[in-house]
């Protein structure tokens, strides 16, 4: 789970069952197909707007009032179509997000609340902290952002191939002279868009890669703080009886201090990244015009062609700059998916340990018609290996009463956990 590729693959292994689960797959594939179809529609509308942009500025340059009025009605049709498509796409996307989240939450809860694993998880897998927060918050972030990323990547790919052809045709050729070598570069604006987006993406990754770890740490600290508040509420009576308010306040103050430290680390990373992204945002509307300006000044294209070319360049550059625009969200998503995957890996370890043959494991056999509770060669040890009970032999008959006595920490409660089959 150390690379984005392995993180995506691990999360897909955990969460992709939604598209094959009985009772879910038909709706899942219908919603997915709807998103793809609406993505194609939106790109078609964007191409329609690009053509309208050319015609409008050409008519404006010619002061053709009749054509301008006609184009106003065309614009109304474009805006109306775009509004309907975006609204439907939003509805489909949100339904897919909530359905996927509900399925993954139910699967995780079922694995967590089975055979005492919710107890064993805290005892045997201490690195998996706050499973409740992972189920409630991290699954939500993982599924919602995954759907958003899938939608935006699809939109980028469709828009890229659509407007690459438009930009290639509009670019023409540019004569290049390097020393004594002269040649014509076809589709020069396409290469400019690719270079611009590639440089921006590399700089974004270099400045923002630390955000993934910072986001993971911050979410862990947020979960620790929530867990501390929940524990104080659940043990309110005991805290009051022991006059433990001061200790609880100190514990919560420490959690809040750790949260602030993690927040500050994340803020510094986001600040460094924003220096680049804000600069690129200011340059975004200007660079396409500068790149297309030589053809306009050379009289090869009219004003409408200049604006159409600039818009096509912006569309290609936007498609290639997905990482620049989404890196902060990607860092947040990566941190949440890691936490969800680690929870499932820990549950898998517990399931495999329960199924694997082990002579040292406590085996509980339930006999409904027996009047005896038998313990044979029962040994109970702490997770660190310290023995609490060694080879206990006990026979308890119905309705005998038994008192288990011993010092605190001697294993009285642990014996009951062993009998219940959760140790």
Predicted regions and their residues:
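Membrane-integrated ABC transporters
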Residues: 1-46, 55-75, 89-93, 97, ...
